[in-house]
């Protein structure tokens, strides 16, 4: 029986980003119609973590919009992590942009176990989707994460117009980093964003299978865009190699009801992992 790891995310600071990533509705440059706020109340975050745990999640990710982990953001994320840990037995993941070693060490002291920082795509293609920071900055952050002893979660977004060569280059870069977890996101179109999706179900299944074969020791997670690219047939991706899903809502888009996902997983004979 295949074990599936469930992860939930909390967008604790939304839409406050000055970067120009063409795939992201949280950039103020594109003016997407999303809910924007500076800080989510700590009590709300704890309650979301409790619900995630109740729904079977072993990981809970604290996400902030913005380029990187400045001092103010660091203090807030540490407070949120400590608040959750005090009341909920769940692994804390942080996703707060580019970060230096000292800041990452502080997160670790606060109880964060995993840091998520995606390369998004290949080094060659990245300048075509973002001009306000470099791919190399992202790669350096991933190296910093590993150097301080945090687990690294690092993946990308597919269907943004990248080529097969870009995907191969991206895989080579990930092999250098050896991440513990690899989230596979499939681009979600928005009328305000300048990109159009170039994926379909067959492409997505092929992508999942390729990453599962290349990274046999990593957790391969179906993340953003799962419902759009696979529809009701998303368990097919688990059968070709994925072993984790994000449950509940994403950063700025709605997800499937967690109880419905759980029902489908159990009905199809999957086991829910009880530790991250």
From Swiss-Prot:
Annotated function: Catalyzes the conversion of dethiobiotin (DTB) to biotin by the insertion of a sulfur atom into dethiobiotin via a radical-based mechanism.
Family: Belongs to the radical SAM superfamily. Biotin synthase family.
SUPFAM superfamilies, per the entry: Radical SAM enzymes (SSF102114)
Protein's name according to its UniProt entry: Biotin synthase
Reactions the enzyme catalyzes: (4R,5S)-dethiobiotin + (sulfur carrier)-SH + 2 reduced [2Fe-2S]-[ferredoxin] + 2 S-adenosyl-L-methionine = (sulfur carrier)-H + biotin + 2 5'-deoxyadenosine + 2 L-methionine + 2 oxidized [2Fe-2S]-[ferredoxin]
Binding site for [4Fe-4S] cluster: 17, 21, 24
Protein's pathway: Cofactor biosynthesis; biotin biosynthesis; biotin from 7,8-diaminononanoate: step 2/2
GO biological process, one term: biotin biosynthetic process
EC number(s) stated in the UniProt entry for this protein: 2.8.1.6
């Amino acid at each position: 029986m295949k074990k599936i790891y469930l992860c939930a995310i909390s967008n604790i600071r939304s839409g406050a980003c000055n970067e120009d990533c063409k795939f992201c509705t949280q950039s103020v440059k594109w003016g997407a119609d999303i809910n924007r706020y500076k800080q989510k109340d700590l009590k709300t975050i704890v309650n979301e973590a409790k619900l995630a745990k109740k729904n079977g999640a072993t990981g809970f990710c604290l996400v902030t919009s913005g380029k990187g982990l400045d001092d103010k953001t660091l203090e807030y994320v540490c407070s949120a992590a400590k608040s959750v840990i005090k009341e909920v037995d769940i692994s804390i993941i942080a996703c707060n942009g580019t970060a230096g070693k000292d800041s990452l060490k502080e997160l670790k002291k606060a109880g964060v176990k995993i840091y998520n920082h995606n390369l998004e795509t290949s080094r060659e293609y990245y300048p075509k989707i973002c001009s306000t920071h470099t791919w190399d900055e992202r790669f350096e952050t991933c190296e910093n994460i590993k150097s301080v002893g945090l687990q690294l979660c690092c993946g990308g977004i597919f269907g943004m117009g990248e080529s097969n060569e870009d995907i191969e280059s991206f895989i080579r870069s990930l092999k250098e980093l050896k991440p513990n977890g690899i989230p596979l996101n499939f681009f979600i179109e928005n009328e305000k964003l300048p990109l159009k999706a170039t994926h379909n179900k067959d492409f997505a299944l092929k992508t999942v299978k390729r990453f599962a074969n290349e990274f046999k020791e990593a957790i391969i997670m179906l993340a953003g865009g799962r419902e759009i690219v696979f529809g009701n047939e998303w368990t097919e991706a688990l059968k070709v190699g994925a072993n984790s899903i994000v449950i509940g809502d994403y950063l700025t888009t709605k997800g499937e009801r967690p109880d419905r996902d759980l029902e489908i997983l159990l009905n199809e004979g999957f086991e829910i992992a009880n530790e991250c």
